[in-house]
Swiss-Prot record:
UniProt-recorded name of the protein: Chorismate synthase
Subunit description: Homotetramer.
Function: This reaction introduces a second double bond into the aromatic ring system.
Organism of origin: Streptococcus pneumoniae (strain Hungary19A-6)
Enzyme class name: lyase
EC number: 4.2.3.5
Required cofactor names: FMNH2
Cofactor note: Reduced FMN (FMNH(2)).
Gene Ontology BP terms: amino acid biosynthetic process; aromatic amino acid family biosynthetic process; chorismate biosynthetic process
Record lineage: Bacteria, Bacillati, Bacillota, Bacilli, Lactobacillales
Keyword Translocase on entry: no
Amino acid sequence: MRYLTAGESHGPRLTAIIEGIPAGLPLTAEDINEDLRRRQGGYGRGGRMKIESDQVVFTSGVRHGKTTGAPITMDVINKDHQKWLDIMSAEDIEDRLKSKRKITHPRPGHADLVGGIKYRFDDLRNSLERSSARETTMRVAVGAVAKRLLAELDMEIANHVVVFGGKEIDVPENLTVAEIKQRAAQSEVSIVNQEREQEIKDYIDQIKRDGDTIGGVVETVVGGVPVGLGSYVQWDRKLDARLAQAVVSINAFKGVEFGLGFEAGYRKGSQVMDEILWSKEDGYTRRTNNLGGFEGGMTNGQPIVVRGVMKPIPTLYKPLMSVDIETHEPYKATVERSDPTALPAAGMVMEAVVATVLAQEILEKFSSDNLEELKEAVAKHRDYTKNY
């Protein structure tokens, strides 16, 4: 399974093409749109979310509510594009029109300046348009397809925010994936501790009044994962490594950890390793899950627990200093629409990319042309694992 996305932030549409989804997977536009709505939600979101109400359109690969095995093409129309027809025109236009909304003041922390240098742009909007987090719309759409596949294999996935701008959220112990999903969905800030809800919302309001932004940490948890996804035989086949790449590829994500993560560096080995248990009912399990569901780059049957750290959104309403690329004079950075935080939305993107990598790994291990064969192969593997 592989995919590509295309489109600009203020272009006419966003597109994704997925190849490798088995035939026979039940799939509707609403399956995708539900996740797109969640990506646009969350406390503190700003103007763009009021303009766009994302709806996906299938143009190939789905017929009568089921996948056909052909490449799946999905489009999302950018409604805001009508205000940008000249600025984002694919055809050559007059110089006076080209200068409208031209960007020469790069924003610190964005791709603006480095993209301009790399691709030799005199208008940094070319960098901004593709590097914008608007692109993650289609990664969420791709992830929604992947999640439908995982659900057919009795795997479940959820995300929630565990740190908001330095404020750690207390997470009750032993929550199931379903409980995490339910609690986070009921929260405007995607946390599982309702007692902290108003405190976090007040904090976001204060950050907005200050013209500043905050980052934080998002956790994704996956249950029902088969044993043995990934491999130790080559460095690039380790599944946790593939997931790490996917997570830090998300806009503004700067770090990733599994299970205890960096805390493991402060503990003794006897306090980190997960003891192995066996029972006739459950087969092999672990007493703890400090390693986040991985051993040797492979899934061990425990829930996958992965966290990603998101830096504060770099577009500030009190902009930092920058330099004009034409005059080299100091200027305040360009201000585009921005939010004080996008952590709840980022959680949806992280959930999507994790689901996508897991779907790719499932289809690599249990290669199947249709859903029925895939389900049979996974069920057979689970029986084998339990009786090993």
